[in-house]
């Protein structure tokens, strides 16, 4: 039984300048990033690399159409390295760009063509949530299928994962919270996954501690205090990525995908809507497994009784990021059934990682409670 894989070499630099100079970014490199990152942080240190801004191809979550249009614009140009500097959307797209190109990226996500890596991939995350710099997963909205779908393959691992706290310090508050909540959920779902083991647990627990303790300090000292402890979130997110990259995530992510895909809710925010409700259901189904350890861990960090762990967690997170019923994002009541079918049909890759199996009825009931 394989216990742990950490495929990329992990680097950390204080500044973008240090990163650009160390990796000698220049001719033969393709940088995928955002203009608001490129202009202040990267442009003056770029020695001839082609730079493309992801937002030119559309806003929000990555999609198969976005990927197709970028590949079309690349045309016959040949690159040695793909360098992703950005959040989850940039990273997910860059992973696909590191592969041998196909006419339609939908074929990759639907398994119709093989994944063949033919370029080095350097990932520099600029949010503190995806952990995607150390995972072999890429997720995109499939426009023609009206859902989000992920593919997992070792061909998608980065060659180098590079942590640069300078990027995170300027992250707008809303993006900081939604991305770091996503990291917390990665760590927690990975901890209760049937694929978890002592190695992944070590990364999960430390990630949960770093992120939750950081949140508690922010509530006490103000939201701007996050800049003082930003490395805790950067490292915590990376640890969470290592955990879920090996153990997987489950129902929280699976049920959130139709919401994110159809109503363009940011990924971390969509996950947060389902987080505590699904873990309460897990506990009702089987209170004696690892969910008991999660409750104990949360209670210790949040200084509450184990029976109040999820309520206390919700109270803490609600102070940082407000939640709304699903209907306020645009979801229609009749979509409860269709979304449940969509999850069962398209998200088995995630559902197999559930702490306890979720029936169609469980999925429908979860949507109803949150509607």
UniProtKB/Swiss-Prot annotation:
UniProt activity-regulation remark: Inactivated by oxygen.
Keywords for the protein's UniProt record, in alphabetical order: Copper, Iron, Metal-binding, NAD, Nucleotide-binding, Oxidoreductase
Classification via Gene3D superfamilies: 3.40.50.1970, Dehydroquinate synthase-like - alpha domain (1.20.1090.10)
GO molecular function, one term: metal ion binding
Residues annotated for Fe cation binding in this entry: 182, 186, 253, 267
Cofactor: Fe(2+); Cu(2+)
pH dependence: Optimum pH is 6.1 for the reduction of succinic semialdehyde and pH 9.4 for the oxidation of 4-hydroxybutanoate.
Catalysed reactions listed for this entry: 4-hydroxybutanoate + NAD(+) = succinate semialdehyde + NADH + H(+)
InterPro entries the record matches: ADH_Fe/GldA (IPR001670), ADH_Fe_C (IPR056798), ADH_Fe_CS (IPR018211), Alcohol_dehydrogenase_Fe (IPR039697)
Keyword Iron: yes
EC number in record: 1.1.1.61
Residues where NAD(+) binds: 88-92, 126-130, 148, 267
Induction description: Induced by growth on ethanol plus succinate.
Co-factor: note: Binds 1 Fe(2+) ion per subunit. Binds 2 Cu(2+) ions per subunit.
Protein family: Belongs to the iron-containing alcohol dehydrogenase family.
Quaternary assembly: Homodimer.
PANTHER family: ALCOHOL DEHYDROGENASE (PTHR11496), HYDROXYACID-OXOACID TRANSHYDROGENASE, MITOCHONDRIAL (PTHR11496:SF83)
The protein's role, per its UniProt record: Involved in the anaerobic succinate degradation pathway. Catalyzes the interconversion of gamma-hydroxybutyrate (GHB) and succinic semialdehyde (SSA).
Protein name: 4-hydroxybutyrate dehydrogenase
Species of the source: Clostridium kluyveri (strain ATCC 8527 / DSM 555 / NBRC 12016 / NCIMB 10680 / K1)
């Amino acid at each position: 039984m394989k216990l742990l894989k950490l495929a990329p070499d992990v680097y950390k630099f204080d500044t973008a300048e240090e990163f650009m100079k160390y990796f000698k970014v220049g001719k033969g490199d393709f940088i995928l990033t955002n203009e608001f990152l490129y202009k202040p942080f990267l442009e003056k240190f770029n020695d001839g690399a082609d730079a493309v801004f992801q937002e030119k191809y559309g806003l929000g979550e990555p999609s198969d159409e976005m990927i197709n249009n970028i590949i079309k614009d690349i045309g016959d140009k040949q690159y040695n390295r793909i360098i992703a500097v950005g959040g989850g959307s940039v990273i997910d797209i860059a992973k696909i760009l590191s592969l041998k190109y196909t006419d339609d990226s939908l074929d990759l996500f639907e398994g119709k063509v093989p994944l063949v890596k033919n370029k080095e991939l350097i990932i520099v995350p600029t949010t503190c949530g995806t952990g995607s710099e150390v995972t072999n997963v890429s997720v995109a909205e499939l426009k023609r299928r009206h859902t989000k779908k992920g593919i997992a393959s070792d061909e998608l691992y980065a060659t180098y994962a590079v942590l640069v706290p300078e990027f995170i310090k300027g992250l707008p508050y809303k993006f900081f919270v939604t991305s770091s909540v996503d990291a917390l959920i990665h760590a927690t779902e990975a901890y209760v996954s049937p694929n978890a083991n002592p190695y992944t647990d070590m990364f999960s627990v430390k990630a949960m501690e770093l992120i939750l303790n950081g949140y508690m300090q922010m509530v006490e000292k103000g939201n701007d205090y996050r800049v003082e402890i930003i490395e805790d979130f950067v490292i915590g997110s990376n640890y969470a990525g290592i955990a879920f990259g090996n153990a997987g995530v489950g129902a929280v992510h699976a049920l959130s995908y139709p919401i994110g895909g159809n109503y363009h809710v940011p990924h971390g925010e969509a996950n947060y809507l389902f987080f505590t409700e699904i873990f309460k259901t897990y506990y009702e189904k089987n209170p004696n497994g690892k969910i008991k350890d999660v409750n104990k861990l949360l209670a210790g960090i949040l200084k509450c009784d184990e029976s109040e762990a999820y309520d206390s967690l919700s109270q803490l997170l609600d102070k940082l990021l407000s939640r709304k019923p699903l209907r306020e994002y645009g979801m229609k009541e009749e979509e409860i059934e269709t979304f449940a079918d969509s999850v069962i049909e398209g998200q088995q890759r995630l559902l197999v990682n559930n702490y306890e199996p979720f029936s169609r009825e469980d999925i429908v009931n979860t949507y109803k409670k949150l509607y």
